[in-house]
Amino acid sequence: MTVLDLSYNFANLSVHDLLEARDTYHYHLLSKANVVGTAIGLYLIRKDEAWPTRKGEGKTPPNKKTYARTLSNSEVRDYSWPCILAFVRSWANEDAFGPAGRYDPAQIVPKTLYLADGRAVPVCVVQADQAGSDTSATYSPPGILPAHKLGGGSPIIVRVQGAEYSATAGCLVSDGHLTYALTARHACGEADTRIFSYLRSGEVEIGASSANQLTRKPFSEVYPDFPGRRSYVALDVGLVRLDQVDDWTSNTYGLPPVGPLGDVHEKNLSLRLIDQPVLGRGATSGLVRGTIKALFYRYRSVGGYDYVGDFLISPAEGLATRHGDSGMVWHLDATTEDDAANPKPLPKRDLRPLAVAWGGQVFEESGVRSAFSIATSLSNVCKLLDVELVTDQSRGVSGYWGRTGHYSIAAFAVALVGDTDLRDFLNRNLGILSFDLDTIAEKGFDKSVGQLGDNFVPLADVPDEIWKKLDHGKNGREGGRDVSAGPHGSDGPEHPNHYADIDGEIGPHKTFRAACLADDSNLTVDAWLQYYETMAAKAKADGDEDGARRHRNKLKQGLLPFRVWQFFDAMVAFVENKDVVGFLTAAGAAAHYMGDASQPLHGSVYSDGDASRTVTRHHPRTGEDEEVSYGSGVHSAFETAMIADKAAQLFPLIKQELSGPGGHALPLLTSGKAMAKATVELMDKVAGILEPMRILDSYEQAGAGTRKATLDGMWKDLGDDTAQVMALGARYLAMLWESAWVHGKGSDIPVRNLTDQNPQDVRARYIQTSFVPSLTLDKIGDELT
């Protein structure tokens, strides 16, 4: 090449230049039967191509590879230049075109597109044959769902003409008057169609579809400064008008609190976005990760018009989007790393809501299918719908809604264990028992549990997340112990093991709880069965037939202290047999029950309100007043919503309660019956500190429900005492662990065996229904020693 020959500096090409070239050659590219799509991006270099050692070798390598370039065998490098990406069904070398070749020369994709003013735009040909997508008829959750708050990543369900359609709630937006969940239009239906979602307890009705929806817009209307004469920006975005905004958080489940909008427009949109990491949470796939592979992907042409998606996103291995993820928001990971060798954990990453996933493109290469996500700019969506992103709705709620109490009590208890070997063993396996306290206190929390499904679940939540489930069906779990399904969730023998309504008045004692503490003969299965029969007779005499049936129902007769007794016996046996996996599994699950015992509402007939009196509440959907029991809804508001919302303030108070010397400061016990009595003692203490009726009164006085004002009011009234009862729960749990360890002669187990355990070995134990089996009160006696 001489100084007089034309030389093109492709690195100076702008997004505008690339779009102008594609627009100019619109019909030319459209005529290529082999071309299935185009986009703009950076030139892809085959991964085994030698890196350039001299100037110019990047564009013209001395030993250039000629085999098919695909999305998986090529990459963007720091010297990649701007280009138009042309995706073709099949690959053919240049010699296959022409008189002696197999193909018409007119069908060859040009290497360069030349504009009238002398600019030249390179074309990068990529083999990426389109394939049909996988679909699923009904929604199936990817893992454990939130117990309480809905938010980004929650499923959106609509039923139209006998068919069910699912999508994902991407984020919350507001028009200044109402708040909406943004999702895919196809899961909204016509205006005012009722929309549903799912929590752990089952399906919930959340609102109605809005008439404000998007389908497609002319490219020139969305991007007036960019060329695109015969193109549509494809959109599939709808809004769900929420019945009760306080049921929602602006955060995405399992991700850090939502950051500021990743605002994209003609003036700042550049190819620097290529290869940038993004992540989101789909209702079907759970946590997904990817990278932005191309911009303005033309995926279809009809009647001479192109249909274009703003972003083509390549999935990370094993983390692709699927049917039901439409509506999900992709978050741009804009984190600045302080130490590249130790990247910041997910809760501390800087994520910016960037794009709404509305569709997918499946490419097939050598029989392997890869699902790419097509997404549109969230800033454009907000502009076209005339709404703004909501970032401050229940910001403190993110990650593990409903788990905070159980996990934190287990984490606090480990430090209180006196036996050095046992404490070290539990500390080494804290990730199996629970999470460390700093992680639990993070507003974003880590992603692990939210992605679990039928994989490993930290033990402190196994009784809720595994055993209180069916072992089959849509919301089933392997290892589930429930036996029947109903309109409000499933039921089975595990459920009554979590509580004991023993503050009913009986005999000379004010409560049956007091009678158990005063006389050990009341700590028998027969005495408890007689108590429930007495309560049933009393309810019937008062005209409360529902109450009478409840007290006689074997699945409603709470037996929490006997469940702790059963676990003490099991842990002792595991220690005696030197079965460290069995002991660890039982110890972690037992943390859940001692956590339940430390919550006053788990030991009271007022567990979710006082049925003997009613209050008038305004129904958010019907707009009408209704009569409900006094305190109805208090259980989840106090134990789930308030504790999760106030975790950052609660944990320092608990640490202060536990700051003195002496560990758990409780005597070690040597029998299951003594441990059952200690559990009743704990329930009595926490009821004295935080009387159940006081919780109900605070809830009603604060306005009921789970609005921020209600949670703030309850925290002001109950916060200090909540810390005190949770600290007691941690003390009694540490005492339970150490008592079983010492009584079973844990000192005989070689220290070399007290190592890090494999979570899958632990899971293999708890999915067995015979592992510390879940039994009703009338059946558990045979298990107790």
UniProtKB/Swiss-Prot annotation:
Keywords: Antiviral defense, Hydrolase, Protease, Serine protease. The keyword Kinase does not apply. One of its GO terms (molecular function) is serine-type peptidase activity. Transmembrane segments: none annotated. This is Probable serine protease Ga0098714_109514. Its EC number is 3.4.21.-. It comes from Bradyrhizobium tropiciagri. Residues 470-503, 608-629 are annotated as: Disordered. Residues 470-481, 491-501 have a biased composition (Basic and acidic residues). It comes from the Bacteria. The keyword Hydrolase applies.
